[in-house]
Swiss-Prot record:
SUPFAM superfamilies in alphabetical order: Metalloproteases ('zincins'), catalytic domain (SSF55486)
Gene Ontology terms, MF aspect: metal ion binding; metalloendopeptidase activity
Top-level EC class as recorded in UniProt: hydrolase
Cofactor: Zn(2+)
Gene: MEP4
Name listed for the protein in its UniProt record: Neutral protease 2 homolog MEP4
Function: Secreted metalloproteinase that allows assimilation of proteinaceous substrates. Shows high activities on basic nuclear substrates such as histone and protamine. May be involved in virulence.
Organism: Coccidioides posadasii (strain C735)
Removed propeptide positions: 18-183
Family the entry assigns: Belongs to the peptidase M35 family.
């Protein structure tokens, strides 16, 4: 009887907990424009202009305005996208300093000049097309808290590359790899004993998160899946589940898999928590990763060490191809991505899987609670009241597949 009442309450609330109305970011947004121009053999200048009528602050990180050798542009040769050989950095999005934003009044612009040979092998030379397309994360002009996002697509820049000159460009990834090869020859050899112990445990919890994500993508709530990935057909669900299973297979091996982990890197600066080098299947765990986040978090949609490691694993193209990109961070932003970006966005996978795995009721973890009929949980904080006293709190996203099972297989 008590369990039946719980299900009734949750069913009534669930329609608002997993809204279909989370607005996707339109690719036709015109408030921000990006213009690319060639300023040397492989040097490109990007000019970002505020075309709107209000001041905005554009996040430079993981964008065409970033000085870090991230995926600022895509390069195409003979109609085929060339392999990205740069780095992807995971940033702390909750404690961003002022200098990682470009504040633009209406009509103002910011620019960045970079060498595309840093992140793409152009030694063969010849004609290529350069394009930047993606998302700018935005803050209000008086804040450093992310409050929205805007889609953009640049012009297509044609360049005839001199391969001999391009081959002389030292790629940031290549320089980093040589330094790592001097120091790192096996799993976690640059980590302290405490960090090694922590990461070994985190690989186990990452396996659990990935397993939960795979189960949910295969048999879970269609409504929840659609909130994150925008489509619910098998052509969408199967690759999502397959990526999770591939990650689970990798992280369960611990020290015998494809991916190598290190705790030492000269790029670990500022807000960077971790760095993914998909080209050589290398993940760097930066010092702030251990100090800024708990191993797991009971807060709904919160970032924790396990979700960061899962996020980084989705970038690894040798684990599951293609590796993901970093279009957006955080629940509010990833759920606004269109379908083609959502299925290739690392944080979409991380948040979806984390929400499917870990929550509390009477401080009982999901693997135990999911086997007990009647222990069904909700998307946000939900105190259960008995005789005026709080007897438990759900603090992680509701496992909707469990609710669906108790509702006789009906989708929310």
């Amino acid at each position: 009887m008590f369990a039946t009442a719980i299900v009734a309450v949750l069913l009534a609330a669930a329609s608002s907990a997993f809204p279909h109305a989370a607005r996707e970011a339109s690719k036709d947004d015109a408030n921000v424009s990006v213009q690319l121009s060639a300023v040397g053999n492989t040097m490109v200048k990007a000019v970002v202009t505020n075309r709107g009528d209000e001041a905005i602050s554009v996040l430079r990180l993981n964008s065409v305005l970033d000085s870090f050798p991230c995926r600022r542009v895509d390069v195409y040769k003979e109609g085929k996208k060339m392999e990205f050989e740069g780095l992807l950095a995971h940033h702390d999005m909750q404690n961003l300093p002022d200098d990682v934003f470009a504040t633009l009044n209406p009509g103002d612009f910011a620019e960045n000049t970079f060498d595309i040979a840093e992140t793409v092998d152009l030694s063969a030379g010849g004609p290529v097309t350069v394009l930047s397309e993606g998302v700018f994360l935005l803050a209000r002009s008086d804040s450093t808290s992310i409050s929205g996002m805007v889609q953009y697509r640049s012009n297509e820049l044609k360049i005839d590359v001199d391969g001999v000159l391009a081959a002389k460009v030292e790629s940031a990834g290549g320089l980093r790899r040589r330094n790592l090869d001097k120091r790192t020859s096996f799993y976690l050899d640059t980590c302290t004993p405490a960090a090694m112990k922590n990461l070994t445990a985190l690989l186990k919890s990452t396996t659990d998160y990935a397993d939960a994500g795979a189960r949910a993508a295969t048999n879970g709530s269609l409504a929840t899946f659609e909130t994150f990935f925008k489509k619910t057909d098998l052509r969408t669900r199967r690759p999502v589940a397959s990526r999770f299973r591939a990650i689970s297979n990798e992280t369960s091996i611990i020290d015998g898999g494809i991916v190598r982990l290190t705790c030492s890197d000269d790029f670990c600066k500022g807000t960077i928590n971790a760095i993914a080098d998909s080209w050589i299947s290398f993940i760097t765990i930066c010092p702030r990763f251990f100090s800024a986040y708990p191993p797991t978090s009971p807060e709904c949609h919160a970032t924790d060490q396990t979700s960061i490691l899962l996020h980084e694993m989705t970038h690894m193209r040798h684990v599951y191809s293609p590796g993901t990109n970093d279009f957006a961070y955080g629940y509010d932003n990833v759920t606004k991505l269109p379908a083609d970006q959502a299925i290739n966005n690392a944080d979409t996978f991380a948040i979806y899987a984390a929400g499917k795995f870990f929550f509390f009721w009477f401080f009982v973890p999901y693997p135990i609670a999911s086997s007990i009929p009647g222990l069904i949980y909700f998307h946000r904080f939900l105190p259960w009241m008995l005789n005026g006293k709080v007897i438990g709190t759900c603090r992680r996203c509701m496992p909707t597949s469990l609710l669906r099972r108790h509702l006789g297989g009906k989708s929310l």
